[in-house]
Structure formats: C-alpha cells, structure tokens
Amino acid sequence: MNGYVEFSPSPTKESVEPQPSQAVLQEDVDMSSGSSGHENCSMGRDSQGSDCDDNGKELRMLVEPSDTHSSPDAFRLMMTEPQHNPSTSGCSSEQSAKANAHKELIRTLRELKVHLPADKKAKGKASTLAILKYALRSVKQVKANEEYYQLLMSSESQPCSMDVPSYTVEQVEGITSEYIVKNADMFAVAVSLVSGKILYISNQVASIFHCKKDAFSDAKFVEFLAPHDVSVFHSYTTPYKLPPWSMCCGVDSFTQECMEEKSFFCRVSVGKHHESEIRYQPFRMTPYLVKVQEQQGAESQLCCLLLAERIHSGYEAPRIPPEKRIFTTTHIPNCLFQDVDERAVPLLGYLPQDLIETPVLVQLHPSDRPLMLAIHKKILQAGGQPFDYSPIRFRARNGEYITLDTSWSSFINPWSRKISFIIGRHKVRVGPLNEDVFAASPCPEGKTPHPSIQELTEQIHRLLMQPVPHSGSSGYGSLGSNGSHEHLMSQTSSSDSNGHEESRWRKSGISKNGSKTQTRSHFSHESGEQKEIAVTEMQSSTPAQAKAAPTVERDSSGSSLPKASFPEELAYKNQPACSYQQISCLDSVIRYLESCNEAATLKRKCEFPANIPSRKATVSPGLHAEEAAPPPSKVSSHAEVRARLSSLTLPDKAESVVSLTSQCSYSSTIVHVGDKKPQPELETVEDAVSGPESLDGAPGGLSQEKGPLQKLGLTKEVLAAHTQREEQGFLQRFREVSRLGALQAHRQNYRAQASERAAPGLRNASGMDSSWKKTGKNRKLKSKRVKTRDSSESTGSGGPVSHRPPLVGLNATAWSPSDTSQSSCPSAPFPAPVPAYPLPVFEAPGITSTPAPPEAAHSSFTVPVVPMGAQPDFAVQPLPLAAPLAPVLAFMLPSYPFPPANPNLSHAFFPGQPHFPAQPTFASEMTPASQADFPSQTPLLRQQCTCPVTPPAATVTSGRASPPLFQSRGSSPLQLNLLQLEEAPEGSTGAAGTSGTTGTAAAGLDCTPGTSRDRQPKAPSTCKEPSDTQNSDALSTSSDLLNLLLAEDLCSATGSALSGSGASATSDSLGSGSLGCDASRSGAGSSDTSHTSKYFGSIDSSENNHKAKVSTDTEESEQFIKYVLQDPIWLLVANTDDSVMMTYQLPSRDLESVLREGRERLKLLQRAQPRFTEGQRRELREVHPWVQTGGLPAAIDVAECVYCKSERKGDICLPYEEDSPSPGLCDTSEAKEEEGEQLTGPRIEAQT
C-alpha cells in the first residue's frame, strides 16, 4: 500500500463511473501504482512486508469497473479492501492480462528513468513520481511548441515564403552534399516548420549515431533533442529569424564566419547507447529557410534546413592548440552568468544555455571561491580597466576541474556609475584529466547551492552596488569627459558626485580629451571645502534647480537665473544631488542642439513657458562657424555672439571651455595646465549669495597669489589634480547659482513683459532680453575680475563698498545708461581723462521712470550723474568727488596704461580728437552727496562730443571675420585670466592696455558707459540706481581681462556694430549701435538698473518699462546687483567698421616689425615654459597619440582657423601674427602676440 498511498491519483479521478474512456483512466492508474511497485520492488527494495503483492492486488482491483467505486467513501473502502479481504484477487484470464500490462509498465518506467536529468534525481535515485512529472512536462512542452509553430506559420508563412527558394527532396540532398561531404561529423536535415517532422536527413547520421537512417523517418526532430534544448531549438528556428538558403548557395563553400554568426548548440541522440542512460552528443547547428516539396505534385512547405556539426572535446584529437584555448564569459553583479563564449563549448563541455543564468561560484573549486570576492574588489577599483589575476579552477561538465588564467574587466553604467556586468577572459592553463569534457558528471551537485556560496554572492553583490571610484576606459566612463560633456552633468543623476567619481571622470578626461582636461584644470583651484559644500548643497538642491542651474551655467547669459525661478523647478526639495558628469553631459547635448542654427534655438523655446523670452541665445560650439564670417548686418548673428560671450564669462562653463571657444585656443589651453593660480570666481559666488559684503580685500589677496608661473610637468597627476579641483569648483558654483533660483520667481512676469515690450531691434536672435541675458556669467566673472585686477573695486555684491583710494590715471566716470536711474558717481574718482576715441554720448533722461525715446540719444554725448540719494537702498560708500565726471569714452592704449591726463596726446595720436580740459566741472542734474573735491578734477561742463550722429560709413557694414586685436588666442575667460595673471608680475601693461579697465571713461580700458545698465539684476530693480552703477566702471576695471577675452571671441562674430540693431553685441554697451550711432538706443544707454551686460548693452525700451514695473524689492536688488558687469568701450571699437575707425586710428605700424618683435618675445617666453622630461613625454604620447605625430587632435584639427585664418592643418596656431594690427590698436596687438606666443610655446615643446 505504500506505493499506492503515496502516488495514487486524486480520488475524484477514480470515482468516475466506467465509460468508454475508462481504459485510459485505468491505464493512468496502472502507471501510478505500477511505478510505485517498481520503485519499491526493483529499485528501493527497502519497504517492509509484501508491498509488491499489495500493489499487484491494488492494480487488479482498480482496473475492475465496479460500481462500488462511484464515491469517495467507496474509494476509501476500496483502498482498505485488499488488506481485509485478500481473497478478492482470483486467478483469471483478466488478471493475467493485467499482469502483462504491469510488466510493460515497469519496462516503460525504466525507459523513462534513462531520460530523467541527473539534477532531478533525489539522492541519486529516480523517483517514479519525478519520472512521470518530467514526462508529462516534456509532452506539454512539445505540444505547446507545435501549437506555437502552427500559429506562427499561419501568420508569417506568406511573407516569409515570398523570397524563399523551393526545392524537392532530391534537390535538397544535392545542394547540401557539397557542404557535408568533406566532414564526417556533419549532417544535414530538413525539418518542416509546419509539422515539425523530418522531411529529409542525410546519410551521415547512420555513422554519427550508429543507427539506421530509417530511425528518423516520419519522426519529429525535437524528439531526438535533449529536453532542455528543445526551447533553444525553437527560439533559433523562428521563421522570420532564419536566413534564406540563397545566402549560402551562392558561395563555393560554407564559411565558418557564417556558421558562427547564426549557429546554436543542441544535444542530439537517437537512442540509448548504454542500457542505463542515453548519451547525447553536442552539435553546432546552422539553420536556413527553404521550401521543400515532399512529394511530386504536393504543395511546398516551409522548412528549416539544418547543417549540424558534432563538437568534440578540445582536449581530444584533433586538439585545440593550447594558445587558442581562450574563451570569455560575462556575469552580472549577482554572480549569474550572462553570456558564455562559444569557444567555451569544447573546452568546458557546457553548452551556452547550460551556464547562462546559473551561479558562477557553483562552477568554481570550493577553495577558489573566496578569491572571487577579492577579484570583484579589484574590479571595482579598476573602474573598467582590465587586469590579470591569479588562476582559478573551473569545473568542466564531466566533473573535473580546469585551471584557468583569468583577466577581468567590467562595464560601468554611464549614469549610475555602477558596474553593469563583469567580463572575464580565460585561458586554459591545465586541462582535465578526463579529456572527454562532454561526459556526464558522476556526482552532479544538488540544485540548492551551498550556504557559503549564497553568502559570498551577497557580499559580492553588495560590493558591486557601490559607485565605481575610477572611470577607466569601460563603457561611458571615458565618454563623459570630453569637452562638450563636462559641465551639465552635475545635475541629473545619481548620488555619485563624490571625489572618487570625479577622479574617475578626471582620468577619463585626460585619456580622451587632453584639451578639455587641461582647460578644466584652470578651474581646479577651488579648495576642498568648497567641493564638500558643493556636494552637500547639491544633494539638498532640487532636481529642477539642478536642471536650471546647468542650464544657467550653460546659458550663463543671465537667462540662467531667471530659469531657476520657475515654481515647478523649486517643487522638489530633497532629491539626490546630480553628478558633475551628468550635468555636463546634458549641457553639451543641449548646447549642441541649440548651436545648430536659429531654428534649433527657437525649437528649444517650446520647452518653456511662453512668458519666458527664450531659454538662451545659445551658448554653443556651433558659433565657431559664425565667428569665422559673421554676417555683420544680421541681428541673429549678434545675438548669438552676445550669448556666446556671456557663456564664456561664466566660471561654471570652464569645464567645456574648449567646446565653447575657438579652435585656436587649444594650444593656449595646454600651456596652463600646470598653472596653480587660484580662481576667485567661487569666492565671488559666495559673496553674491551670502549677502552684500565688500570685496575690497579681494584684489589684494589675489595679488599675493600672483606669484610667477611654476614650472610643472604636464603629468597625469597634475592633470588629475586640476581636473578634480575643477569639478569640485563646478559643483560648488552650480549650487551657489541654484540657491539664487528662489529669488527669481517674482521676476518671471517681469521678464515676460520685458520680452514683449522689447524693441525688435534690441532683441537677440533667440528673442531673449539682452538686459538679463548677461547676468549669469558676467556676474561672477565680474567679481573674479575684481580680484584679478587690483585697480578695480567690485560692487557686484551690491553691498557697501569699502573706501579705496582712486587709481591714478583713471577717470572715474559715472555712466548712466538708464532713463529711470541716473548713474551715481564711481566709487573711486580718477584725476584726468586720457586721450580717447570720442564716442557719441546720449543725454540721460531724468530720474523719472518714463523711458526715454530711443531716438533722442543720438545727438549728444552727455553724462548725467545720479546723486547718491537716488539709490539709498544700496549701501554703497561713494568716495568723495568734486563733481561727477564726464563719461568720456576713451580707449586706453596698451602702451599707456593709466597715464595722467595729457591733452597733447590727444592731438599726437588722435588728430581729430578735441582737447579735453583737465576735467572741468560737469553740470549734472543732481550732484552726489558727500563728494569731496579732487584737486585734479576741474569742473566740466556737459559737453557734446563732435561725433556725427551717423558716421560716414555707418551704413557700410563689413563683416570683419577677425580683427587682429580681438582674435582669440585663448578665447575662454579662464585662459585669458590666467594669461593676465602670468603677465602681471612682468608688468600688467599689455594686459591692462588691451583689456578695458573701467574706472575711467577716457583713460580706463573699460570705458563702456552702460556698465551698470548692462547688468540686469536678478531681482526687480528699483527706480533708484543701484550701487552698482556708481562703481560700474570700477567693476569693469577688474573685468579687463575678461573684456579682452570677450572682444577676442567677439571679433569674428560681432558683425557690423553700425547696424544700429539691438543685436550688436558690443555697440549695445554704449547705448548706441556703434560709437553711439544706434538710433534705437535710449538716452545715455538705457536702464542702469537693468544691468544688462555692457558687452551687449542693448538696453531696450522694454528695459525701461521693466524698471517702471519693478520698484520695491531693494533688498533683493542689492542681492542681485552683485552680479552686475560692465563693459569696456573698446568692444564698441572692435565692432565698429574699419571705415568708421579710420577717423580715430593711430598711425599704423609695420607688420613685419610687429611680427619680428612678437617672435623675439616668444623666444624669451619659451624659456619660462615647462620642460617635459622623457618620462613625461612618454605619458603624453600614451594619453594623446597626436602628440607623437605632431598635429592637433582630429577633433579640432580644422582646415581653417576661424581666428588666424591659418589653412595649414596641424599648424600651431599663433593668433595675431598673421593679421595686420587693427587701426589704433597696435600695442594691443603686440600684447596679444606676446600672450599668444607664451601660450603656444609649451605646445611646441610637447609636440617635439
């Protein structure tokens, strides 16, 4: 009874009354009880008493159709009846028949036991129940596959059969014979995809399987496959996946490549080779799709034509050579095989499907399993780089172990920075003792893994869930660090923005894009604590802010901060911080899309609310083309230039400086990798965010750090250190900018109204208000420049500015570009004007909030002065002034930095320029309070410059692709600042001369009147002038370096400054199209408080209206006024047409003499450049192959340089040497040549 009680079917099945189908039911019962008896009698023989007899009695009893079995109660009685009534089993003919059936059942069960996989045997014995369940499952699987094929063929037979060749059976034999005749281990078989039956099989099967060919006739091919390979066979023989036979028949011989590409592995067997088991042989099968006509006149049916080749052990003849016993595997962090190389089949004995999704550790020798933890630790440290490790022992299918030399690497998810899968490359060192690796293992391991395996797997999984600390070369690790990727990424993603990750990306940057890494190294001077602050703050920042900030940094034209004001961007508070790589990556994508053309820019505008004028004018590499030959009269080109320049000024963009700047800047970028000078931008941001505070001590602090350039080798370590610090600074700056987002919400409507009211001529190509486009970047760089130049006092913070002595030779001009707010006197007055280019100045309307008509500004160059009382909300401490100084727009020659006023110079160098009195009293509408007289300043009456409203050639606009003075030898603000810092010890003459130092209208380089006007505060500005306007020129004094940079980048893209359109990037800064000739400008520039960048001082009438609307938030105005920037007047000059500038030009110098002097200076400067040792050169050659070949990297090896017009590929770009000096700017050209030579020197050495 034991067997029956254990394995009997459900009583409900047996309680059915006898019917015609009762025979089948009885047969099932016979199988159950018979198998039980067989198990206990023939196999187990471990049960007590007469179990077999009882089972026989049960069998005979159950098969009798009896009405007493019609209920469960009767069934229970039936179960107990044999015990109490042994006489029920009589000897009759029916009983003998049942006994024969029983014997047949036992034989069938024995046959089934042979097919039962070893892993399903309990304790090495085949359970009868397990056998029956396995058989039932196999039948269901085959039947399901057949049904699947029927459905598949009914829906796909027509499309598939259109191009499929049709053959008869004889033709199939003929076409396949040429492929199998040369290989005795190969056979061909045609399997119907409709019925699954074998329509044709070659004669080789008889020798391969040692059976007759008739064994395959009218049989289904899947019946000969190992049960667990049936699904593999079906998956690879789906009709739409099969290539037609025509692909193969056109070739003389079947190529191995073709087989490897489409082949799969299955085990095939015809029958049992031994009485106890069936030996399956592994085959590589290559399927093709054909049509076969089974009989003459019958309809052709789709078939799968298989070319099957038997696989031999790689250690048996013909052996695989030891040097070729190599295969690869991949597994995922939870230590399950993900993929196994086909080359592993003859070496391990496993088919790919045998190992996939099985534990790796199970296949290893128990003593080698702990090594996997150490291996995975090193994998994590290597960050994708391959490395070798000690040999491990891997178990083959026959149960023996093979010693493998292993090499490991990994693929890193580019977003999560976690390992996605591990790649192992294995080479067989020692083969198995039993060379037949396909033999079955004598002691198969149980299905349940050992507890130690589970524990070790969990440890490895936890380990690999950590972010990878090094980038290495795997996957995206190297991708994220090209120049265009770098800086958007700090936002979007994972919490992996840590020092390890940054070092990882840093390495990647070094290996993939030297120029980018080197450029990034300029901004790597921020301290570690700043980086920590950045990380913590970013983690607390909102994702929307994160998105806004990179966009901000990307735009950096002032549109950045307004974007942060979206309420939805402030919605989520405690989101994880985004990584540096993700921010820069997203930023590069967005910048690229926006740089394609104006249409792309307009397309991006759809992403934002309609009240936002535009995301930005596009800070993008796409402007390079525009720089080469800008259409002078196009508003769009100017607008893009404006955006481009603004983006250059943003410190946060330093990471992608290479992608933003000209190709010529590459060599200059390389030079400054070793530069250790600190960057003050981060401090500026901190100042801006923390509240108004004086930046008085900043220049002094910087001057102390302006030591001579240290001679440092361009090693991987130096680049890595710079890169890490730069990323830290980037994250910090991003966070600081993001914090400003909360203060911007109230300006959303303001900006929308501004964009609506803005005059068409004053708009950017992107429709963005130029008034606020500049705030983002210029704000920070303004403060940076304050620290860079000691001569400047930063009022960018909007806080009270500490008293500083005036700079000698600088004319402190209070320039009031706004109709609503007259500019206050600068914080530091300067004794006298320097000979200057007279530019038209516009009368500033009264301090009323009514915007002045744009047309009223042409005729005169008057400078209204705003009293200090007009801006009480800004605690700016003005220096005493005798009188407001006239905003005489002067261009400071490089050779005359801050000279005392000398009227004679004006005639000597400016024949057409009228003499300026020392500084006569300037009658202004209002005098600033608490102004002390300066002895050198005499009252100046408001006077009008005799500059024609429209210069003679105002209508003639020539798109000067690259004026020599403003060509970019290092077009990023960072590069230029570093250059200036380097040259400062030698004398700031050249740098100071070339870059406009604000502080003087006549002598200061930054003579752009619309200084404060050009900056649009991040908060609504009041009608009163912010303190920034008072110190506007002083602010630009510190920005001289940046001004020079911007002018350089602007040179090729400014177009005509005389066009009068608001898009003129630099002409806007004066409030006049160019030289004050823009009829659309208002007053003396417009809107002091709008603080549009002086560089693009297109103060729209809309800005004036803006100021009429914004009136009260003075505290926030103070907060945002810190980000105001001022522009130098020479930007106007740069954009002025040559025909106009002829009136004011200096005597031209001989081009050859200029070049000769420049080359001499270059030779002198080269001596101070770093010298590379042989080891350092080897490192450079390893990281940058182009160093060895001597050219530029392919990415930037352009045929024509957009600045110097050099058409020689790979030529060292020496800007300014090939261009004749700009009229009146010869000394500046010299200074630029000097800087350009200094930059390119180390590059020449590096290439040698």
Swiss-Prot record:
Residues 774-787 have a biased composition (Basic residues). Residues 389-432 form the PAC domain. Residues 9-24, 32-50, 510-521, 1083-1102 have a biased composition (Polar residues). SUPFAM superfamilies: PYP-like sensor domain (PAS domain). Residues 523-534, 1103-1112 have a biased composition (Basic and acidic residues). A motif (Nuclear export signal 1) lies at residues 105-114. GO terms for cellular component: cytoplasm; nucleus; perinuclear region of cytoplasm. Expressed in the brain, mainly in the suprachiasmatic nucleus (SCN). Expression also found in the harderian gland, lung, eye, intestine, liver and skeletal muscle. Residues 506-706 are annotated as: CSNK1E binding domain. Induction: Exhibits circadian rhythm expression. In the SCN and harderian gland, maximum levels at ZT12. Maximum levels in the eye and liver at ZT18. Under constant darkness, maximum levels, in SCN and harderian gland, during subjective day at CT12. In the eye, maximum levels at CT18. Residues 816-827, 987-1004, 1057-1080 have a biased composition (Low complexity). Residues 1-57, 467-563, 619-638, 675-708, 751-829, 950-971, 984-1035, 1057-1113, 1215-1248 are annotated as: Disordered. A motif (Nuclear export signal 2) lies at residues 456-465. Residues 175-242, 315-381 form the PAS domain. This is Period circadian protein homolog 2. It comes from Spalax judaei. The gene is PER2.
